[in-house]
A protein has these predicted regions:
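Active-site groove signature of glycoside hydrolases
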Residues: 33-58, 138, 142
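Glycoside hydrolase catalytic-domain groove-lining segments
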Residues: 108-134
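Acidic/aromatic-lined carbohydrate-recognition and catalytic surfaces
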Residues: 1-9, 42, 49, 54-85
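Structural preference for beta-strand elements that scaffold enzyme active sites
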Residues: 47-49, 74-78, 97-99, 135-138, ...
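Substrate-binding/active-site clefts of carbohydrate-active enzymes
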Residues: 1-39, 64, 70
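Substrate-binding cleft/loops of secretory-pathway carbohydrate-active enzymes
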Residues: 58-70, 81-115, 186-195
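Loop/helix patches that line or flank the sugar-binding groove of alpha-linked glycan CAZymes
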Residues: 121, 130-136, 141-142, 147-251
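Generic structural signal for well-ordered alpha-helices
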Residues: 37-38, 61-65, 122-123, 164, ...
């Protein structure tokens, strides 16, 4: 399957003839994409989150990422790779810094939080990584997934706290917090394109309630947050502080 509405770029793979690869001479798409990467890197961004990176030949990333890092050594490349069999390929050959841990830890923690699996299933997650756990990016929310507090997930942001502690403290790898997650954003608005599906729209101009309250008209003082927002935020602050400062967890 693929996105029907997107422009298709030729990375040098002949998908009509058995997926044969034609990488020499360097495909024109590679050169153009490298120029785009270098352009944005020059704007002092922190890094790139590469959507469905496994749908692009690993040979491209192997070629492009070192060139970007040569010019901008501190920049990060995070890949969305959902096939565990390709994890090491995109980490070690493709040169990515981190991969989303979606089909392993995220899916398991969601099932545990919703009562579909026992917490013992978490053991298989870390064992299956077998040495690359430090290269995985943990998360509980992102633009693709339903909000913890939504009716489609846990229905209450506090029910996600045990999963937060596991994600943040189990290993020394990074943990991503999606905007408004720390306030218990519901994601239950009926936005124009996607409707009420438990996600915050990425297709519409929309006002996210918890973020609007935190911004407070540009003051960014959080004074419009509810007591429930503030309480959850304090828990997130404590957990994230502990996982970064407590040596038993951070080392």
């Amino acid at each position: 399957t693929d996105w029907y509405e997107t422009v298709k770029l030729n990375y040098g793979v002949d998908y009509q003839n058995g997926g044969t690869c034609h990488f020499s001479p360097t495909p024109d798409t590679w050169i153009k994409m490298l120029d785009i990467l270098l352009f944005w890197a020059s704007k002092d961004i922190d890094g790139f989150r590469c959507d469905m990176a496994e749908m692009v030949p690993v040979e491209f990333w192997e070629w492009a990422i070192p060139q970007v890092k040569e010019a901008y050594p501190e920049i990060l490349f995070i890949a969305e790779v959902y096939n565990p069999g390709e994890y090491r390929n995109y980490l070690f050959r493709g040169k990515f810094d981190y991969l989303y841990d979606k089909v392993g830890l995220y899916d398991t923690l969601r099932n545990v939080a919703c009562g579909y699996e026992s917490a013992s299933a978490i053991t298989h997650c870390w064992q299956s990584l077998n040495g690359i756990e430090k290269k995985m990016l943990n998360f509980l929310e992102n633009h693709d997934e339903q909000r913890i507090a939504s009716d489609f997930f846990a229905g209450n942001p506090r029910k996600g706290i045990p999963a937060l502690i596991v994600s943040a403290c189990m290993n020394t790898n990074p943990m991503m917090i999606y905007f408004g997650q720390e306030f218990g954003e519901l994601g239950m608005d009926s936005e124009g394109f996607s409707g009420r599906d438990g996600r915050t729209t990425i297709f519409d101009y929309w006002s996210v309630d918890s973020i609007r309250r935190w911004r407070n008209g540009g003051k960014f003082d959080g004074k419009m947050l509810t007591e429930e927002h503030k309480h959850l935020y304090s828990i997130y602050q404590k957990v994230l502080t502990i996982c970064n400062e407590e040596q038993a967890i951070s080392k």
